[in-house]
Design a protein with these regions (language model features):
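Mature catalytic domains of secreted/periplasmic carbohydrate-active enzymes
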Residues: 1-179
Length: 179
């Protein structure tokens, strides 16, 4: 991935990506278990353009704040369970949700069979509330998990939530309550 439109430095290329765009792409790549190759092209004199320094500084600060969800983590849960990138801790007992563009309100996770012990906003430690809706006691189909995100806890780029689970992540992938 380039930070503008060219690999290497080109004086006329001023179409810089924003830190948000790079961080969002990075979160998507990490959620699939991948690594992001990010091109940094120094000028002829060896200096790094200020636009690239900003991207690197912001990406580095965001990584440090959310390192628990990035370094040593595994690719996340299958698409459709949460609408955004996810990762899983190495022992699979924490699920990390990367919440993009959400200022406050409610997000939803589908098909999570686990009991959630605690939900924390990475980087600031805020504990969040959740509720499970639609779970029927006699059915293996889990309910929908709704997580309330209050105003003021969001990261300026992408907020990361840690769901601490009772056991390794278990997702319901069936077709209904009778299979």
């Amino acid at each position: 991935m380039t930070t503008n439109n060219n690999w290497g430095y080109r004086k006329t290329d001023t179409a810089w990506k924003t830190p948000y765009e790079i961080i969002a792409l990075f979160a998507d790549v990490v959620s699939t278990g991948g690594n992001l190759l990010l091109d940094i092209g120094p000028r002829e004199d060896g200096t790094i353009p200020k636009e690239q320094r900003l991207i690197l500084t912001e990406l580095g600060a965001w990584n440090k704040k959310h390192e628990k969800a990035i370094f040593g983590s595994l690719g996340g849960i299958a698409p459709g369970h949460f609408y955004g990138p996810t990762t899983i801790s190495k022992d699979s007992t924490s699920l990390f949700l990367f919440v993009q563009g959400q200022t406050s309100g409610t997000i939803m996770v589908k098909g999570l069979s686990n009991h959630i012990k605690e939900i924390t906003v990475l980087g600031n430690g805020t504990k969040l509330k959740h509720k499970v809706v639609g779970k029927i006691s006699w059915s293996p189909v889990p309910g929908l998990v709704y997580i309330d995100i209050p105003k003021g806890v969001q990261d300026k780029y992408i907020t990361v939530l840690e769901l601490k689970l009772d056991k390794p992540v278990t997702l319901y992938r069936g077709k209904g309550g009778f299979d």
